[in-house]
C-alpha cells in the first residue's frame, strides 16, 4: 500500500466519495443519554514528497481520561458552527493555530464512536507544510507527523479485543513512532482512512 503515500489530491477526493463502514469501530452507545457531536481534522501534509498525517498529543490533566493521548485536532460541536466541517476547522484553529483559509477540505469519513458517548465526524483535508503552528498549551502538549507509508505497514499495528460493560470491543494499537503511541478512536479513524484510500473508486 505504499502507493497511498503519493496519491494525487484528486484521487484522494475520489476515494473519499465512497461509503465505507468505519474500521474496527465500537458500536454507538445504547443508553438513554443523547449522543454528543464532535469533529476532528485529519490533515494530509506533504513531507519529503510523500503524504504524512498531522497528529497532536493532548496535555496532561488529572482525572482526564484523554490526558496525554495522541489525537487529531478537534472537539465538540457548538451551536454557532455551521456544520461539522466548521467544527473541525474552528477547533483546529483554537488548538494549534491553523487558519481555516489555509485548509483545503477534501471530504469526510463515516462517523466514528467513542466510549465516552461521542459521535465523531473525521474531516479529511490538506494543509501547507511546514506550518507555523501555535499550540494552546492547556490542551495540546505537542504536534508531530507520521508518514502514511509507515501507517499503512501492517507490521506497525495490531488489533486486540477488550471487554467493556460485557461487550467485546476492538482496540487498535500502533507501534510507538518517535515515542508517540497511536491507539483508540484515533487509531480506528486512521485505519478507516487507510482502508478507504486502499480501494479504487
Model-derived regions: residue spans:
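N-terminal leader/linker segments that precede catalytic domains of diphosphate-processing enzymes
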Residues: 1-71, 76-94, 98-131, 149, ...
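Acidic, negatively charged sequence signal
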Residues: 155, 159-163
Amino acid at each position: 500500500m505504499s502507493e497511498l503515500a503519493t496519491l494525487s489530491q484528486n484521487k484522494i477526493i475520489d476515494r473519499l466519495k465512497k461509503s465505507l463502514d468505519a474500521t474496527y469501530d465500537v458500536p454507538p452507545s445504547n443508553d438513554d443519554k443523547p449522543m454528543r457531536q464532535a469533529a476532528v481534522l485529519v490533515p494530509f501534509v506533504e513531507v519529503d514528497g510523500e503524504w504524512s498525517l498531522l497528529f497532536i498529543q493532548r496535555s496532561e490533566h488529572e482525572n482526564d481520561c484523554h490526558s496525554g493521548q495522541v489525537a487529531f485536532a478537534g472537539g465538540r460541536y457548538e451551536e454557532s458552527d455551521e456544520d461539522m466541517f466548521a467544527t473541525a476547522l474552528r477547533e483546529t484553529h483554537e488548538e494549534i493555530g491553523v487558519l481555516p483559509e489555509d485548509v483545503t477540505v477534501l471530504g469526510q469519513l463515516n462517523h466514528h464512536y467513542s466510549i465516552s458517548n461521542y459521535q465523531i465526524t473525521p474531516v479529511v483535508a490538506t494543509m501547507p507544510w511546514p506550518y507555523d503552528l501555535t499550540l494552546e498549551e492547556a490542551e495540546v502538549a505537542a504536534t508531530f507527523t507520521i508518514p502514511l507509508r509507515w501507517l499503512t505497514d501492517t507490521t506497525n499495528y495490531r488489533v486486540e479485543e477488550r471487554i467493556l460493560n460485557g461487550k467485546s470491543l476492538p482496540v487498535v494499537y500502533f507501534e510507538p513512532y518517535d515515542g508517540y503511541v497511536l491507539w483508540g478512536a484515533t487509531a480506528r479513524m486512521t485505519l478507516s482512512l487507510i482502508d478507504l484510500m486502499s480501494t479504487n473508486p
